[in-house]
From Swiss-Prot:
Reactions catalysed, as given in the entry: IMP + L-aspartate + GTP = N(6)-(1,2-dicarboxyethyl)-AMP + GDP + phosphate + 2 H(+)
Protein name: Adenylosuccinate synthetase
Gene Ontology molecular function: any one: GTP binding
Binding-site list for Mg(2+): 13, 40
Binding, GTP: 12-18, 40-42, 304, 330-332, 412-414
One annotated GO biological process: 'de novo' AMP biosynthetic process
InterPro entries named in the record: Adenylosuccin_syn_GTP-bd (IPR018220), Adenylosuccin_syn_Lys_AS (IPR033128), Adenylosuccinate_synth_dom1 (IPR042109), Adenylosuccinate_synth_dom2 (IPR042110), Adenylosuccinate_synth_dom3 (IPR042111), Adenylosuccinate_synthetase (IPR001114), P-loop_NTPase (IPR027417)
Binding site for substrate: 298-304
Keywords: Cytoplasm, GTP-binding, Ligase, Magnesium, Metal-binding, Nucleotide-binding, Purine biosynthesis
Species, as recorded: Streptococcus equi subsp. equi (strain 4047)
NCBIfam families given in the database record: PRK01117.1, purA
Subunit structure comment from the entry: Homodimer.
Upper classification of the organism: Bacteria, Bacillati, Bacillota, Bacilli, Lactobacillales
Enzyme class at the top of the EC tree: ligase
Annotated residues for binding of IMP: 13-16, 38-41, 128, 142, 223, 238, 302
Amino acid sequence: MTSVVVVGTQWGDEGKGKITDFLSSDAEVIARYQGGDNAGHTIVIDNKKFKLHLIPSGIFFPEKISVIGNGVVVNPKSLVKELAYLHEEGVTTDNLRISDRAHVILPYHIKLDQLQEEAKGDNKIGTTIKGIGPAYMDKAARVGIRIADLLDRDIFAERLKTNLAEKNRLFEKMYDSAPIAFDEIFEEYYAYGQEIKKYVTDTSVILNDALDAGKRVLFEGAQGVMLDIDQGTYPFVTSSNPVAGGVTIGSGVGPSKINKVVGVCKAYTSRVGDGPFPTELFDEVGERIREIGHEYGTTTGRPRRVGWFDSVVMRHSRRVSGITNLSLNSIDVLSGLETVKICVAYDLDGKRIDHYPASLEQLKRCKPIYEELPGWSEDITGVRSLEDLPENARNYVRRIGELVGVRISTFSVGPGREQTNILESVWATI
């Protein structure tokens, strides 16, 4: 039994897709356990970029099984579009498996997401308007439609009618918005269901059988710990649990079967959307990092907010996800800076604190306490070992490991597979 979980340790966009793709070469099954098509990940293969939102990164390995677990909310329209995109690029999807227990995102979820966000005005969350939150709301309220329901014409029709009646009352009475007709959804989405039917199965059986047989299983998280609905910067969070604990709920695999948790982070910090961000940069350094790092959302295209590396955030992520190994990305983006900074603690009303506050009001008053290190000017994109890094870059990497309290297993100096350097194989140490 061998399993590794890959989680984002910041606010998403840490490079999880790249690291999952890298670790997938030694895995036999790759599974996604939460989120929806609000999460974008970019994989670079032979200098060609592939952008995915729903399908696991392991799809590029035809001999390996790729799983969309029960904790994922699936927009069938987006999924069919993504499948077509992969087919056009010559990528086979015969190795894809989709949980029959996964919940379905429908047009009324997307409409409700938009109306709710507009109604919040200045207090908006900054969602991707993909219907993720409303779909998880229906799931918790026990009125959601699952993939298994979508495949049964009569059951889908019955449940869609019931849900539309409720949602349309909400649209008309609360939001003064036009209702959605049954015929606008039913045939189109039933057809999507039939198109993906061949991939649908009980994925918990596949995953547990693989683990019991001693196969290597890689679990791929979406978003990041700081967007977790319980452990993140609530309410500026997603509606699911990206933390490693989400694996057990979102994949149907027990906690005793999880061996390693790899936390993925960048050598700086970024986030999309609203919410607290103590180390955010508003100067030319921030603009430089954004441009060199191509910090624009895969899903939204929005410019990402950027800031210095925050070890307070990282220690919080380490604790709540049980991170055993760290994967540090985008070190190359900081090349050329005379000085690099790491936030080591916060100043809250004159008192030093080392933990991340739950209160948004306290977070607003937190000022980062920085440790400054000398930067480096060398081009490091061709570096293939820690020893080959310039001394200042090497010291920066080591200091991050010390402050977070987790050993660094891999570090990356660019987006390509070949630019990921192994310090310690997470598979070999299990």
